[in-house]
Amino acid sequence: MTIKNKVIIITGASSGIGKATALLLAEKGAKLVLAARRVEKLEKIVQTIKANSGEAIFAKTDVTKREDNKKLVELAIERYGKVDAIFLNAGIMPNSPLSALKEDEWEQMIDINIKGVLNGIAAVLPSFIAQKSGHIIATSSVAGLKAYPGGAVYGATKWAVRDLMEVLRMESAQEGTNIRTVTIYPAAINTELLETITDKETEQGMTSLYKQYGITPDRIASIVAYAIDQPEDVNVNEFTVGPTSQPW
């Protein structure tokens, strides 16, 4: 199998893991449809890809809106005739103790981290079912595997992603739709996630952790590329990825 000429949608593509994955997949010959809310950043990434003889387009997308997700898939099909894979990567991590009662941030995490993934699945599933193939990749987190103080709501949203993706894999196998799923559980990866934390004590603790252990997002990009490059009859459905030096 090869990544070359595969049509791949990436959400949360304007920075961090999404950006790193876009650049790597473009280098390997994929045709990309990049999605995020920050259009100016998407424009620069697409310019970089095209300057290196790659192929990519972009669309301003709010993953919390069903119509934005549907239009994203429609754009990919209109431009390239199909969708082979979608990387549901958009997410936020405004961690805080439950006692801080940051209810607005709780809702934002639920909307982006859970509903955003559901909206992406709903948008692409009809095409994947019709063509009896497709690859759905989602960014969860080690927080979806291991609880820690300050990460209650974030961890809950990432556990939800884990469950959604596993059930999707099981149902696809039962229904014979040949849809593969991959769930990635990153640990300390140096992205913009920490910028979403408003609780000072939590922000200081997480910043210290990431400064000590954090690795670059291209490490996750290589995992995404590896998964997409597998034969159609192989589903490598889970990856936990973190710094060698990080104890958890």
UniProtKB/Swiss-Prot annotation:
Q: Where is the active site?
A: 154 (proton acceptor)
UniProtKB keywords? Oxidoreductase
Q: What is its EC number?
A: 1.-.-.-
Q: Does the keyword Oxidoreductase apply?
A: yes
Gene3D superfamilies hit by this protein: NAD(P)-binding Rossmann-like Domain (3.40.50.720)
The terms under GO molecular function for this entry are: oxidoreductase activity
Annotated positions binding NADP(+): 9-33
Q: Name one Pfam family in it.
A: adh_short
Alphabetized InterPro entries for the sequence: NAD(P)-bd_dom_sf, Sc_DH/Rdtase_CS, SDR_fam
Enumerate the residues binding substrate: 141
Instruction: Fetch the PANTHER family from UniProt.
Output: DEHYDROGENASE/REDUCTASE SDR FAMILY MEMBER 11 (PTHR43115), DEHYDROGENASE_REDUCTASE SDR FAMILY MEMBER 11 (PTHR43115:SF4)
Family, as annotated: Belongs to the short-chain dehydrogenases/reductases (SDR) family.
Name recorded for this polypeptide? Uncharacterized oxidoreductase Lmo0432
State the organism of origin: Listeria monocytogenes serovar 1/2a (strain ATCC BAA-679 / EGD-e)
